[in-house]
Amino acid sequence: MFALRIAALVAAVLATGLTAGVFYAYAISVMPALNRSDDRTIVDVMQKINVVIVNPWFMIAFLGTVAFGILAAVLHLGREHRATLVWIAIALALNVIAFAVTAGFNVPLNDQLAAAGDPAQIADMAAVRANYEAAWVRYNVIRAVVHTLAFLVLCGALFAAGVQQGKAEAAGSAQGVTAYAAPAGLGAPHAAAHTR
């Protein structure tokens, strides 16, 4: 069961880290570069990116931030895992917030950009860009920061899980030693009786 709990937790860590990394890359490279481009370039490039980004590799990581977090939380229910569960719950809440930012703001902006149509046919390209770029960049930074915080908290959860497992193994070893020593101690009076 320990292996399954750790596997779910590691999956949540990886999914969150990868998703945070994607949005971080947008924030520090993709969008600053496009900001230096003309109106048609940013509209054309972002329309294409918004199509290709919806692929299994990204969706597994993006949806996994919440799905794997829920699985890890369920597997850590119980008093003995309470410390780890607190970390997981905080990270899950952060990932849900970031997910909501994407679904509530970035995706509608992407849909709005797609609805503008073929860049070659757009009459007022500057207006399309103005209604999209600044808002999208702002919400992307927010979700990148929140996912990154969730990633750090999940790393804390992984550490806490390791500490708890170490304590459990140490306690089990101590009980084993006590159980082994008890019969030897009980045998001492019998040995003394035979010497009389």
Language-model regions, residue ranges each:
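Interfacial loop at the N-terminal end of multi-pass membrane proteins
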Residues: 18-63, 108-134, 169-172
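Interfacial segments of alpha-helical transmembrane regions
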Residues: 2-16, 74-97
